[in-house]
Amino acid sequence: MPPLDTIAAVATAVAPGQGGIAVIRLSGPVAEQVAQAVVQCPGHQEWGSHRILYGHVMAVDGQRRLDEVLLLLMRAPRSFTGEDVVEIHCHGGVMAVQQVLERVLEHPGVRRALPGEFSQRAVLNGRLDLTQAEAVSELVSARSRRAADLAMAGLDGGIQARITVLRERLLDQLTELEARVDFEDDLPPLDGTALLNELQAVRVELLALVADGERGDALRHGLRVALVGRPNVGKSSLLNRLSRRERAIVTELPGTTRDLLESEIVLDGVPITLMDTAGIRATNDAVEQLGIARSEEALISADVVVLIVDGHAGWTETDAQLLARIPNDVPRVVVANKSDLDGPPLPGLVDVQFSALNGAGEDAFVQVLLERCGAGDAAGIVLSLNTRQRDLASVAAAALERSHEVAQQQLPWDFWTIDLREAIRGLGEITGEELTEAVLERVFSRFCIGK
């Protein structure tokens, strides 16, 4: 049953100040009626689906023009949601957008859309499967080209196709088992070994998808990398080298960085937030102490910590103390900076030598950095399951493992089907074949309004 109400929201980002264009999106049974009531289109323009019309949004009194707009009507089912959809393209200033949206919402039967409600209706109306809807959100939030590529692979149906094939393979095996439960005397013996091999093959593919998804998280969400070290070892110089701009003040005065500086970069397709921390040392300066406290917090929150030492001065007791302060569960990379200068021998725990001055060792540093946080081969990933999808794939894989254990115990066929059904149900929940209110709430509550 189609929704009885029509929803409306701003579908484009509206930042404070002025913008070029904004889009007000409507979807539902009275969307076209609202457009005809709100927008006055002069001349002999032909009103029809998938046509651009020119006009003005008029105030309720029909006398005052609120904005000059373009109007696009897309009648069901040829629209994003599968319902009648209207897009009003207005000017992007905050007041212009606010006035147009408020005018639309004044019409009976129209309400503000909930987060992700347009995409949710697209799923309920069969325009998208659940993985494609999630890919829309991921494409909007992509922070790198590779993240956008992965999102497009999902939007093109790559995840849905892969999961559907695996689910159908399990359904084939379930059909064989259920036939034996009901009509075993009328059918030839079942090849239990072949069945188990098929279940194991599906399980292996699921675990591979889970592993790729975990690596793909680095592409989707990025990594937070804390640069720590004694004062004046070159943390800020390293940050500036990698970000290719003078983000941090670089001087010969120890303790110059007194706060936590951040720089957004992309390394081999992975979005990286570099956190240039204050040099950790004993000091009586209250401001510097605050920066050092934030540096300590960065050690805990980072996905990987880069300890920078002065290769020219050599390894010191302070370097060893800093290394010991990095939490054991946080990956770390030890970098000896100033490789362009002569220095004493360095201990074997130094991972790479680097020169922030001329860039020597930069490629090696990037490779080690990405490998330490599990993103070393992320650039080669074709499909990447998100957290929800990975959780369900893991549940399915665990159920298939239990099926194998049941087989080893030589239990009757109907015992095999219990875990097999759970695996099938989990895969169906990934794509939306198994859809519940709880699943819809979990997925779409994280979306932006207007998507």
UniProtKB/Swiss-Prot annotation:
A biological-process GO annotation: tRNA wobble uridine modification
Pfam families: MMR_HSR1, MnmE_helical, TrmE_N
Binding, GTP: 232-237, 251-257, 276-279
GO function term, MF aspect, one: GTP binding
Binding site for (6S)-5-formyl-5,6,7,8-tetrahydrofolate: R25, E87, R127, K451
UniProt keyword annotations, A-Z: Cytoplasm, GTP-binding, Hydrolase, Magnesium, Metal-binding, Nucleotide-binding, Potassium, tRNA processing
Residues that, per the record, bind Mg(2+): S236, T257
Amino acids binding K(+): N232, T251, L253, T256
Cofactor: K(+)
Co-factor binding comment: Binds 1 potassium ion per subunit.
Superkingdom of the source species: Bacteria
InterPro entries reported in the protein's UniProt record: G_TrmE, GTP-bd, GTP-bd_TrmE_N, GTPase_MnmE, MnmE_dom2, MnmE_helical, P-loop_NTPase, Small_GTP-bd
Places the protein is found: Cytoplasm
Entry GO terms, CC: cytosol
Residues in the signal sequence: none
CDD domains found in the cross-reference section: trmE, TrmE_N
EC numbers for this chain: 3.6.-.-
Occurrences of domain TrmE-type G (ranges): 222-374
Chain's role: Exhibits a very high intrinsic GTPase hydrolysis rate. Involved in the addition of a carboxymethylaminomethyl (cmnm) group at the wobble position (U34) of certain tRNAs, forming tRNA-cmnm(5)s(2)U34.
Subunit structure: Homodimer. Heterotetramer of two MnmE and two MnmG subunits.
Family according to the record: Belongs to the TRAFAC class TrmE-Era-EngA-EngB-Septin-like GTPase superfamily. TrmE GTPase family.
Protein's name according to its UniProt entry: tRNA modification GTPase MnmE
Gene that this sequence comes from: mnmE
